Amino acid sequence: MPEGPEIRRAADNLEAAIKGKPLTDVWFAFAQLKPYESQLTGQIITRIETRGKALLTHFSNGLTLYSHNQLYGVWRVIDTGEIPQTTRILRVRLQTADKTILLYSASDIEMLTAEQLTTHPFLQRVGPDVLDARLTPEEVKARLLSPRFRNRQFSGLLLDQAFLAGLGNYLRVEILWQVGLTGQHKAKDLNEAQLNALSHALLDIPRLSYTTRGQADENKHHGALFRFKVFHRDGEACERCGGIIEKTTLSSRPFYWCPHCQK
């Protein structure tokens, strides 16, 4: 499943294609959304927001389209009039004069009013988004030490969207490698230096992945600015200590780590 950085980059691409342009045609696959087709035609998309792995597409008439890709959903941008070659099932089409955005295969799609946004079950449950620039390491540290989360093992906590939205498995293993901790630790057992390091890494690594993954700087990094240190690298040497990276299963997900330098 895509994690927060990938969802945010997808939202950026959608915004770049149609934000601020009048919608010339709107189509929904689900019957409960059909009444909104005429209501949205002629409106503009004012912004596309991410809440972890959910997208909120805000329209100028005050409505918001909530969508969660889950495992199979995917958004695409095409030129208006183009017919995509795909076997995926179309769920949403939002069209402007020159660009069209399409949502395929997703099933978790709703139209919300401003009031419903404040009471939506997923949005109520989800924690602060790691890509929200307003979120600080100090706030993350306070959240780690809160009664709700301080006694949770990191193996499960870092996958829980109620803790911090946008984290997922590759971010979980990369963050824990960065701070030299295993997944069995709990916040209540860390010293001050470890807490501070983890609080920063929980924001720094997702934000680095969002801003630089896939980009290259051959002069400085000899490759991608964001590179996996342990994810999918079992059997390889750890670049920090030379130990061999191992793979196991924690919280029902593949977990990659270096037993030599992660304690």
Curated annotation (Swiss-Prot):
Disulfide bonds: none annotated. A zinc finger (FPG-type) spans 229-263. Keywords: DNA damage, DNA repair, DNA-binding, Glycosidase, Hydrolase, Lyase, Metal-binding, Multifunctional enzyme, Zinc, Zinc-finger. Binds 1 zinc ion per subunit. The keyword Zinc applies. It holds the Pfam family zf-FPG_IleRS. Belongs to the FPG family. This is Endonuclease 8. Its EC number is 3.2.2.-, 4.2.99.18. GO terms for biological process: base-excision repair. It comes from Salmonella paratyphi A (strain AKU_12601). Involved in base excision repair of DNA damaged by oxidation or by mutagenic agents. Acts as a DNA glycosylase that recognizes and removes damaged bases. Has a preference for oxidized pyrimidines, such as thymine glycol, 5,6-dihydrouracil and 5,6-dihydrothymine. Has AP (apurinic/apyrimidinic) lyase activity and introduces nicks in the DNA strand. Cleaves the DNA backbone by beta-delta elimination to generate a single-strand break at the site of the removed base with both 3'- and 5'-phosphates. GO terms for molecular function: class I DNA-(apurinic or apyrimidinic site) endonuclease activity; damaged DNA binding; oxidized pyrimidine nucleobase lesion DNA N-glycosylase activity; zinc ion binding. It catalyses: 2'-deoxyribonucleotide-(2'-deoxyribose 5'-phosphate)-2'-deoxyribonucleotide-DNA = a 3'-end 2'-deoxyribonucleotide-(2,3-dehydro-2,3-deoxyribose 5'-phosphate)-DNA + a 5'-end 5'-phospho-2'-deoxyribonucleoside-DNA + H(+). InterPro entries: DNA_glyclase/AP_lyase_DNA-bd, DNA_glyclase_Znf_dom_DNA_BS, EcNei-like_N, Endonuclease-VIII, FPG_cat, MutM-like_N-ter, Ribosomal_uS13-like_H2TH, Znf_DNA_glyclase/AP_lyase. CDD domains: EcNei-like_N (cd08965). Its cofactor is Zn(2+).
